């Protein structure tokens, strides 16, 4: 988990993602960084851009606006329009030994990072022979049912339980 945080965290100083956002290029990215960003770009492509890992500039524009003027309502359209110019997943380049983003871009993998980490932990446990496991790192992923054969019951605090017998559930 620490290794994955060192690659994907938006909040950890020195993470690969933070270094990429600062320098606009990341040389020799880890396999995890490459796989997670490749997955993010695949989802962006399949969703027609509805999911976009380059959304961080737009997020930061909102955060900065509300921090400076908490009671002023929504940011003006010109603030949003300027931030939106940075949001375009098609400008992200994953090369043979580097990742590059536009000078105005900043990435976030928050939309898939927690699930990616949960899946990697579950994969590792499965490869080590575990057949009846529920991994819960904020996102849930099961490897098979309980030993009894019953499904794992997972739910949000206000929801009806959902049965997992070898699958995943993510909520926000």
Give the location of each predicted region.
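Mature catalytic core of soluble alpha/beta enzymes
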Residues: 1-172
